[in-house]
């Protein structure tokens, strides 16, 4: 998502300076939008960038930042103007910049392989050249980037759900109870049938939304919101059902499903909660 917004909205100098190392995975980026007091209401952010002779002096903090304290570059949404969305800009903060610091590594339910921390700015000096696009257009860029991010999260959910389904299906054929494999009990058959159907429907819906976004269709954003909401909800349901099929074994680390359940749960919150997805969808359909 960070690479996309630099590629799409950054000038040539920013692209040449940062993109090569990002796309080669030599450098890691963090997308800094959420703040302690502004999650779903992202436009209420308070991190402020005051104009200086060199560029900007950044003050504030960002919360729940994936890669916080680990990343090489931070894409930061900050307020350079009034209190409306038009007063928000996007800047790039390089790791090691004076005034940049981090909170403790958060202890999370899932996503344990990825560091998450508060990112703090205390008179952090940013060169004017690190402004992405135009001043005051940052919120627009952030929302554009979130469309792609929502598809990414949905795709990750789908992959996790597919794996959980495969584990459960295989287990149901091997595990016997009352003299026969549990896969031959109608209750398990119905669960597996529903899981397979949900996976196929979610996959097709996700591909449709991705195609609309790639082709700049007018309903792309609402289709992305629909896909993110549906796929992440369905994927968590599938993984949770898979755990139930394994019974007590599903609760053990050894079988891998408990990790999928823990990891997929946050996908219903990331990149805009699924409640916010419903708000986006409702506003679109009611405006027709």
PLM regions and their residue ranges:
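Conserved hydrophobic/aromatic beta-strand scaffold that supports enzyme active sites
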Residues: 30, 46-48, 73-77, 90-92, ...
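Short Gly/Pro-enriched turn/cap motifs at secondary-structure boundaries
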Residues: 37-40, 64-67, 79-82, 108-115
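Flexible, small-/acidic-enriched active-site or ligand-binding loops
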Residues: 44, 98-127
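Alpha-helical interface subdomain recognition
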Residues: 9-14, 21-26, 39-42, 51-56, ...
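A short core secondary-structure module
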Residues: 55, 59-102
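Long, acidic (Asp/Glu-rich), low-complexity accessory segments flanking structured domains
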Residues: 122-140
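Helix-loop "lid/cap" segments that line or gate small-molecule binding pockets
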Residues: 1-9
């Amino acid at each position: 998502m960070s690479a996309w917004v630099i590629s799409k909205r950054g000038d040539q100098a920013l692209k040449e300076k940062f993109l090569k190392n990002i796309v080669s995975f030599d450098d890691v980026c963090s997308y800094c939008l959420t703040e302690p007091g502004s999650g779903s209401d992202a436009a209420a952010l308070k991190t402020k960038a005051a104009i200086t002779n060199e560029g900007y002096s950044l003050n504030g903090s960002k919360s729940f930042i994936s890669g916080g304290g680990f990343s090489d570059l931070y894409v930061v949404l900050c307020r350079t103007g009034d209190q409306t969305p038009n007063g928000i800009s996007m800047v790039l903060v390089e790791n090691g910049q004076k005034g940049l610091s981090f909170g403790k590594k958060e202890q999370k339910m899932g996503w344990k392989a990825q560091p998450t921390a508060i990112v703090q700015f205390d008179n952090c000096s940013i060169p004017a050249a690190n402004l992405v696009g135009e001043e005051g257009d940052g919120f627009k860029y952030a929302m554009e980037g979130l469309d792609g991010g929502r598809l990414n999260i949905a795709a990750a959910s789908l992959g996790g759900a597919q794996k959980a389904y495969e584990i459960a299906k295989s287990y149901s054929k091997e595990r016997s109870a009352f003299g026969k494999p549990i896969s031959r009990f109608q209750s398990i058959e119905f669960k597996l049938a529903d899981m397979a159907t949900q996976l196929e429907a979610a996959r097709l819906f996700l591909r449709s939304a991705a195609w609309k976004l790639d082709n700049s269709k007018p309903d792309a954003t609402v289709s992305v919101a629909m896909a993110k909401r549906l796929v992440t909800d369905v994927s968590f349901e599938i993984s949770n059902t898979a755990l139930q099929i394994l019974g007590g074994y599903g609760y053990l680390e050894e079988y891998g499903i408990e990790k999928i359940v823990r990891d997929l749960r946050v996908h219903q919150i990331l990149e805009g909660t699924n409640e916010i997805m419903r708000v986006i969808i409702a506003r679109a359909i009611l405006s027709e």
